[in-house]
């Protein structure tokens, strides 16, 4: 699923407030007792993620970038509420003027990229120009070109191909000024996403960087730098030699580096982790309960943490099968076997769910809107199968994803699709997002798709996942290609609301859109599960709630 960071729930629910700490607190209370050095070895199934900071938009990529990026403001390497407060990093302060439409950041001296070049205000202007660039097609563009949300002056024109310089971003000395078309209380939550980190001009403006052969190929200004990226094989991080403690640079840095191996066999990698040959590895569903029984939960080697994510089956409303076919989309929602689907992931994985907002989304309602009812599903579907053919994209890596795809295929057959008319297309790891994100793909449905919140506001769910005008040629996240004028207007109107009314309207729209439009079938909520070697020092495990994973700079080996 996409990484999706989420901020403290205290942020944005009032429509105006923002938690910003005035100074960087000490990152880890026990960090002084932790061993320095060592390479953290992690293995995973599936294909590798994208690594270009203006392109990468999946969970593992943002976890890595939390270790490599330097941002205007950032989140401390702390768990709980303390980790959800924005603190100054490269910017020492900012001021808001012109009725909330002008943000001026003061950039510190002392930050350097891993290739030795100084980080300046222009490093952030370049990041914004890359995000907005039409040819690069960054998924981050939606966060700065939104007429109902954050809209940087000139960003939409650049994104439409009219030039390469975002006119609303100005640099004068150590001052970075960003002008918005209108005031937006969510701006700081968005400009601190990894898309907008300090970016080296070594990265080409118009095309993606994917291969890294040394520390100079993808310079970064955080505690670590990516020194190698062999696509689908190995991604390596090592300490940034030019990152030294100082103002804004108070983060921990215990490990010498991290090596992430891709495309491993799930059971083999689990066995390697159990034998302490890997420090972190995959956890097959069949092994979860045994590991929990042997090591306990959240004590030594097995850990589980909830995440603000929802799993679903998008139905492509732009392709023939589900286009103008509400009855069939509703039928799928009644036909799927959610409990069996979730069970394929094993214990501690999450629970069945039926609407978009999970319990971590402000405005969510504790209700079940679809229950398994095959008779009703068949009644709704009757006469709406069109040519009877359906193409389903699914994740082929690991054991859980193919098992879930098999459950969905059985559900489709029970609904009335014949076996020989169901085409299953497998994709390794995050490759499924690239395939489904291209407008015009041949998928009618996707399996094992998921969404995790960027920040705790319902806008980040309905308006990002389902707002039609945001659809572009590639890197889409509206995998349903849902573009309905009536619902577009409702989403745009809801985006203008604040406070309790905003949450009430969005909470009802979540239920309404699932019942009356059904562009997807919701399957589940999620927990993260982790299995470690006995080399891992649990005192260094800091679960960063924003990135919903362990902080790499805080991690340590015994």
Residue ranges, per PLM feature:
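Alpha-helical secondary-structure segments
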Residues: 41, 119-129, 173-179, 183, ...
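N-terminal lobe/hinge region of extracytoplasmic solute-binding protein
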Residues: 43-98, 219
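Gly/Pro-rich hinge or "lid" segments in bacterial periplasmic/extracellular proteins
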Residues: 77-81, 183-250, 257
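Aromatic- and charge-enriched surface segment that lines or borders ligand/interaction sites
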Residues: 92-143, 177, 322-324
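Surface-exposed binding/hinge segments that line
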Residues: 106, 123-125, 133-202
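Short helices/loops that flank or line small-molecule/ion binding pockets
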Residues: 116-118, 123, 267-279, 285, ...
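Ligand-site clamp/hinge motif
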Residues: 209-215, 242-291
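Detector for C-terminal structural segments
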Residues: 335-365, 399-409, 435-558
């Amino acid at each position: 699923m996409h990484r999706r960071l989420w901020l403290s729930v205290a942020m944005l629910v009032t429509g105006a407030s923002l938690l910003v700490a005035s100074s960087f607190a000490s990152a880890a209370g026990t960090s002084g007792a932790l061993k320095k050095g060592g390479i953290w070895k992690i293995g995973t199934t599936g294909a590798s993620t994208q690594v270009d900071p203006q392109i990468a938009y999946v969970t593992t990529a943002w976890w890595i970038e939390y270790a490599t990026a330097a941002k205007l403001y950032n989140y401390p390497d702390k768990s709980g509420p303390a980790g959800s407060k924005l603190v100054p990093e490269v910017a020492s302060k900012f001021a808001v003027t012109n009725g909330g439409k002008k943000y001026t950041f003061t950039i510190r001296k002392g930050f350097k990229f891993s290739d030795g070049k100084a980080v300046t205000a222009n490093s952030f202007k370049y990041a914004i120009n890359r995000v907005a660039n039409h040819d690069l097609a960054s998924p981050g563009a939606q966060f700065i070109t939104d007429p109902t949300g954050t809209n940087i002056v000139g960003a939409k024109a650049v994104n439409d191909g009219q030039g390469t310089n975002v006119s609303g971003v100005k640099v004068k000395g150590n001052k970075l000024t960003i002008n918005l078309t209108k005031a937006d209380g969510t701006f700081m939550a968005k400009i601190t996403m990894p898309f907008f980190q300090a970016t080296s001009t070594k990265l080409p403006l118009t095309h993606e960087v994917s291969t890294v052969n040394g520390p100079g190929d993808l310079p970064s200004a955080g505690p670590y730098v990516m020194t190698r990226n062999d696509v689908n094989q190995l991604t390596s991080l090592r300490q940034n030699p030019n990152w030294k403690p100082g103002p804004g640079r108070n983060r921990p840095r215990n490990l010498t580096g991290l090596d992430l191996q891709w495309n491993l066999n799930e059971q083999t990698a689990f066995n390697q982790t159990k034998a302490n040959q890997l420090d972190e590895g995959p956890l097959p569903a069949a092994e979860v309960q045994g590991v929990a029984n042997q090591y306990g939960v959240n004590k030594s080697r097995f850990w589980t943490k909830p995440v603000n994510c929802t799993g679903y089956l998008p139905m492509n409303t732009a392709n023939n099968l589900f286009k103008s076919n509400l009855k069939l989309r509703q039928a799928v929602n009644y036909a799927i076997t959610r409990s069996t689907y979730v069970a394929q992931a094993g214990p501690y994985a999450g629970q069945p769910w039926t609407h978009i907002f999970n319990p971590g989304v402000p405005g969510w309602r504790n209700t079940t809107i679809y229950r398994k009812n095959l008779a009703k599903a068949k009644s709704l579907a009757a006469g709406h199968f069109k040519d009877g053919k359906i193409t389903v994209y699914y994740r082929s890596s690991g054991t859980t994803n193919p098992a879930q795809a098999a459950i969905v295929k059985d559900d489709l057959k029970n609904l009335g699709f014949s076996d020989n008319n169901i085409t299953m297309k497998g994709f390794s790891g995050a490759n499924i997002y690239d395939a489904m994100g291209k407008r015009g793909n041949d998928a009618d449905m996707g399996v094992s798709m998921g969404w995790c919140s960027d920040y705790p506001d319902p806008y980040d769910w309905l308006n990002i996942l389902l707002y039609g005008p945001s659809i572009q040629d590639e890197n889409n996240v509206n995998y349903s290609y849902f573009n309905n004028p009536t619902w577009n207007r409702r989403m745009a109107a809801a985006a203008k609301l604040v406070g309790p009314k905003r949450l009430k309207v969005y909470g009802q729209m979540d239920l309404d859109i699932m019942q009356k439009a059904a562009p997807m079938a919701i399957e589940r909520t999620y927990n993260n599960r982790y299995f470690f070697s006995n080399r891992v020092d649990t005192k260094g495990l800091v679960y960063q709630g924003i990135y919903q994973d362990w902080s790499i700079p805080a991690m340590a080996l015994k």
